[in-house]
Amino acid sequence: FFAGTYFPPEDRGGMPGFTKVLLSVSDAFKNRRDEVKSVSESVVDRIQQINLRKFSDTSNGDMKIDALVNAKNELIKEFDWNYGGTGSAPKFPQPMIYEFLLRRNFYNSEAQVHEALIKTLDSMMRGGIYDQLRGGFHRYSTDMFWLIPHFEKMLYDNALLAKLYLNAYQMFQKTEYSEVVIQILDYVRDE
């Protein structure tokens, strides 16, 4: 019944502060619970309708497969074969892109995609973007080598990267990937 991505500590620039948001959500839940439940159910129903329509459309199946192949090919063209990932500096982890490639590789194994994934995952976990002492990934690397981190860690990045490394561990059976997952989750729990 309520969503957002960032709330400043105090009211600022027309945005409510985090404390005000929490108090408003608490008030709505306590005093307008039926309305909250109704809105929540409406949102869930709408999402389910969209997903059913989106994923049950079997027409143009070849076109959808072609789009996936084209997306994979374009991503591989942009790949940094020396240091992993795409582009140069600053270099951001792209867990959703790597997850897409991982799934593509699961269903249609290709040596080039396999190599790109391993290069990227290994470079990130061995670089300075990964906090070797406390676990968790920094937001991005200020250089193209994944060595110099921008010293900020985001929960959503670490959640996506934990999922990515878990799926990569299941596919490639590299013990280091499972260790990264555990360290990320420990970091998130402790911080």
Go through the PLM ranges and name each one.
Residues 1-191:
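Replace the tail clause
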